[in-house]
């Protein structure tokens, strides 16, 4: 039978159209699906394989969203002395609502036997992992995706790195395919490891920086700063977080990057009532102690927002490739290519909006 006449399920259909797309389209697809990895930039086959495997996660979410009408998205960021997390709910219209957003210190309540800190004993790390899951507030009646990231700074000592690594592995294992209640036929708790490179690319890589950095009075040699510099990316991510919060607070919703804040959240952010634009500090807005705390909270916020936007993009791609039950069609291939191109342009347009705020940022 001709390949054109073969019907396919979703993932094989996506794989087919990825095979037929050119390399440039695949690179753009990796960006809009929050999966861009620099070391795949010269080889089509491993990039396609990686993208299709990533789509498997979002296919599970998409299916649950169709069935249940809502899903919960979580992002967790582990450090040696705390964890930050963000929870958002996405409905079947891809409306995204902020539900929870906290930074929790690893105090004595995360340790056993009245110890003041988490030890590397299995009983301690397992206890801490289960406590993290209980704090997240997963719903037994909804599908919950938990994206997990850990601190990777070279400045952290070996034991601290080891603790974060162990907690990351245990949290992933505890969340992957868990049946929250014994009567559920489908796993309600899913897990994914969040690569910080994906977050940086999705929110930062297309941001024009050169002109704005030249006009920044705090920078004496703008050429010394490049997009790959951690300080530049951290600054852009802070700007993006403030943009999204301001838009949500003012109900000035970008249809592609919308976030809903209910009245309760708006009362928690009084500084947004007394300021305009981005003239506020995330540290003060979130009542945090340090800039590092604000950076950690930014990371989980943007990771969760990225997941919600990628889920929408992925679902639209599925609608395209399944128009004729997954059959190969030149018209569908053109729609596939055009959609990927347009979504990248939309992302580029959004990122360009961050550029002007770099002029006054402290870098």
Swiss-Prot record:
Compartments where found: Mitochondrion matrix
Main location: mitochondrion
InterPro entries linked: Mrs1/Cce1, Ydc2_cat
Record GO terms (molecular function): crossed form four-way junction DNA binding; DNA endonuclease activity; flap-structured DNA binding; RNA binding; Y-form DNA binding
The keyword Lipoprotein appears for this protein: no
UniProtKB keywords: Mitochondrion, mRNA processing
Coiled-coil regions listed: none
Any one GO BP annotation for this protein: mitochondrial RNA processing
Superkingdom: Eukaryota
CC annotations in GO: mitochondrial matrix; mitochondrion; ribonucleoprotein complex
Assembly mode: Homodimer. Forms a ribonucleoprotein complex composed of maturase bI3 and 2 dimers of MRS1 that assemble around the bI3 RNA.
Job of this protein: Function in mitochondrial RNA splicing in the excision of mitochondrial group I introns aI5 beta from COX1 and bI3 from COB transcripts and thus would be involved in obtaining the correct structure of the intron, to allow the RNA catalyzed reactions to occur.
Something else known: Present with 5240 molecules/cell in log phase SD medium.
PANTHER family membership: CRUCIFORM CUTTING ENDONUCLEASE 1, MITOCHONDRIAL-RELATED
Protein name: Mitochondrial RNA-splicing protein MRS1
Source organism of this protein record: Saccharomyces cerevisiae (strain ATCC 204508 / S288c) (Baker's yeast)
The organism's taxonomic lineage, starting at the top: Eukaryota, Fungi, Dikarya, Ascomycota, Saccharomycotina
């Amino acid at each position: 039978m001709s390949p054109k006449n073969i019907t396919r399920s979703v993932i094989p259909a996506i794989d087919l159209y990825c095979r037929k797309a050119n390399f440039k389209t695949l690179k753009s697809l990796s960006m809009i699906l929050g999966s861009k990895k620099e070391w795949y930039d010269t080889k089509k086959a491993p990039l396609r394989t990686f993208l299709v495997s990533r789509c498997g996660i979002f296919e599970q979410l998409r299916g649950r969203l169709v069935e249940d009408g809502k899903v919960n998205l979580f992002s967790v960021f582990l450090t040696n002395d705390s964890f930050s997390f963000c929870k958002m709910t996405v409905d079947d219209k891809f409306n995204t609502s902020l539900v929870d957003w906290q930074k929790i210190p690893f105090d004595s309540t995360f340790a056993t036997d009245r110890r003041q800190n988490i030890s590397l004993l299995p009983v301690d790390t397992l206890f801490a992992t289960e406590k993290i899951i209980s704090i997240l507030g997963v719903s037994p009646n909804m599908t919950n995706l938990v994206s997990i990231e850990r601190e990777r700074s070279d400045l952290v000592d070996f034991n601290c790195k080891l603790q974060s690594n162990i907690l990351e592995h245990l949290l992933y294992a505890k969340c992957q395919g868990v049946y929250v209640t014994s009567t559920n036929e489908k796993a309600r708790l899913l897990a994914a490891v969040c690569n910080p490179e994906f977050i940086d690319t999705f929110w930062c890589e297309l941001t024009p920086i050169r002109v704005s950095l030249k006009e920044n009075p705090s920078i004496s040699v703008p050429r010394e700063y490049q997009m790959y510099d951690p300080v530049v990316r951290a600054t852009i991510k802070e700007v993006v977080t403030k943009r999204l919060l301001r838009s949500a607070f003012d109900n000035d919703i970008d249809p592609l990057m919308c976030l809903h804040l209910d009245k309760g959240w708006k009362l928690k952010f009084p500084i947004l009532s007394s300021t305009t634009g981005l003239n506020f500090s995330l540290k003060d807005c979130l009542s945090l102690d340090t800039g590092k705390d604000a950076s950690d909270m930014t990371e989980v916020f943007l990771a969760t927002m990225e997941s919600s936007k990628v889920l929408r993009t992925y679902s639209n791609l599925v609608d395209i490739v399944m128009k004729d039950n997954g059959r190969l069609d030149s018209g569908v291939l053109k729609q596939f290519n055009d959609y990927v191109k347009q979504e990248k342009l939309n992302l580029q347009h959004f990122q360009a909006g961050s550029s002007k705020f770099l002029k006054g940022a402290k870098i």
